[in-house]
Amino acid sequence: MPVTVAASRLGTAAFDQSPVELRANYSRDDAQTVIRAVYRQVLGNDYVMSSERLTAAESLFTNGFISVRDFVRAVAQSELYKEKFLYNNFQTRVIELNFKHLLGRAPYDEAEVIEHLDRYQNEGFEADINSYIDSAEYTENFGDNIVPYIRSYVVQTGHRTVGFTRMFSLQRGYANSDRAQIAGNASRLAQELARNTTSAVVGPSGVNEGWAFRSAADDYHPGQSLGGSTGLSADDQVVRVEVAALSTPRYPRIRRSSRVFFVPVSRLSQKLQEIQRMGGRVASISPAGQ
């Protein structure tokens, strides 16, 4: 179970569930449940279209020719995985994701990242993936029949505290996708791994935690609405719009992770269009004052 009473607020409550395991004498429905769980975990909850599914590997698994571990391997070494996570990312980001997808945790130190970086450069991507799946850690936690899952939110022998805090930088909520985060393709942990430091726990964005998708030290929180005064009527409501990546010729080019604007609900649609024209990305919308 999650190790904190703030599990629901931090977004870890959804992970308080039994691992998905394929047992003996399984049905076809049981196999499909495992297949869905593998896609969700190994592909970082990214959407998989019907045309992208690994039908050959699914068939081998459903008919008992390969184990859960081998199906995980097939997905992680597939062209689908490479297109989603390898080709468009720096290798440090790829290694972060491999740890999360295959071992269910974040890297503990820079030495782990260097080890996998060397293996990737000298032996190739498939060999590096095999090193996760064939490791003693994978065998001890998942064996041949359990789908990998996020382990950083539970107390286990051999766990380090840094894994708990760092997972909040990699896992941005149960419904979030690893390819749909505000930080994009940037490494989440490279800086703190190099410094041997740990990041503060930052909960996922939500109605009450909208500003939390960036660490507070890097954020800029202006106390004004978008375009000046809100122009409220007596019964109008103001919402808080959190925006990243604003970039226009008339907008100040200052290194800020995000900005917050306060907008009346009656003008929200208009302002969202304006934000889009300014190149911004909306991170969250929540009632003002929360």
From Swiss-Prot:
Q: Which PROSITE patterns does the annotation name?
A: CPCD_LIKE (PS51441), PBS_LINKER (PS51445)
List, alphabetically, the Pfam families matched.
CpcD, PBS_linker_poly
Q: Does the keyword Thylakoid apply?
A: yes
What residues does the PBS-linker domain cover? 1-179
Q: Where is the CpcD-like domain?
A: 236-288
Homology family:
Belongs to the phycobilisome linker protein family.
Q: Any idea what this protein is called?
A: Phycobilisome 32.3 kDa linker polypeptide, phycocyanin-associated, rod
Which organism's genome codes for this protein? Picosynechococcus sp. (strain ATCC 27264 / PCC 7002 / PR-6)
